[in-house]
A protein has these predicted regions:
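OB-fold ssDNA-binding interfaces and closely related basic DNA-contact patches used
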Residues: 1-82
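OB-fold and OB-like beta-barrel modules that bind single-stranded nucleic acids
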Residues: 29-35, 109-117
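A short, sequence-level motif marking secondary-structure junctions
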Residues: 36, 74-75, 91-98
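Short, basic/aromatic beta-hairpin or loop at an interaction surface
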Residues: 78-92
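Short nucleic-acid-contacting surface segments enriched for D/E, G, S/T with interspersed K/R
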Residues: 95-114
Length: 145
């Protein structure tokens, strides 16, 4: 039999929801997993179900492009976004991430190197490519100095 502490239950503050993050094809950085992969079922505004994992971006950099209109012409502004100790919910929407991350389980506390390698395509396939390695393995092969 369980005894529930209703006072503590009403005072309990669950961890706040983190902003979703889908790394771009030029993202390079190291993340630390704060938990394991979990499944989020499709809701009204979502295209499909998605697998996610809460992470802390220890260090990373990504190019951001912003399109705007100036004097009737469309222009693009490019800037570098740097990440440091930011907590996000990593979406495993990209097939390479969805395939690679479970092979690194258990994830909690694990540091993972991610680097976008651009779009890959061939006769019968098209996908976004990423390098996904444990931080220690990335150091061994010289991807991190």
């Amino acid at each position: 039999m369980y005894n529930f502490d209703m006072e503590k239950i009403t005072q309990f503050e669950p961890r706040p929801a983190l902003k979703f993050w889908n790394p771009g094809l030029d993202f390079v950085g190291v993340i630390q997993c704060l938990g394991e992969i979990r499944h989020i079922t499709k809701t009204v505004n979502m295209k499909s179900d998605v697998d996610v994992v809460d992470v802390r971006i220890l260090q990373g950099i990504e190019t951001m492009e912003e399109t705007y209109e100036e004097m009737g012409r469309e222009k693009t502004k490019t800037s570098q976004k740097e990440y440091a100790s930011e907590e996000r919910t990593l979406t495993l929407a990209k097939s390479v991430l969805r395939t690679a991350m479970p092979h690194l389980a258990p994830l909690t506390g694990k540091k993972i190197f991610i680097a976008g390698k651009g779009k890959k395509s061939g006769r019968n396939f098209k996908y976004d490519d990423y390098i996904v390695l444990e931080e220690s393995d990335a150091r061994k092969v010289g991807l991190i100095r």
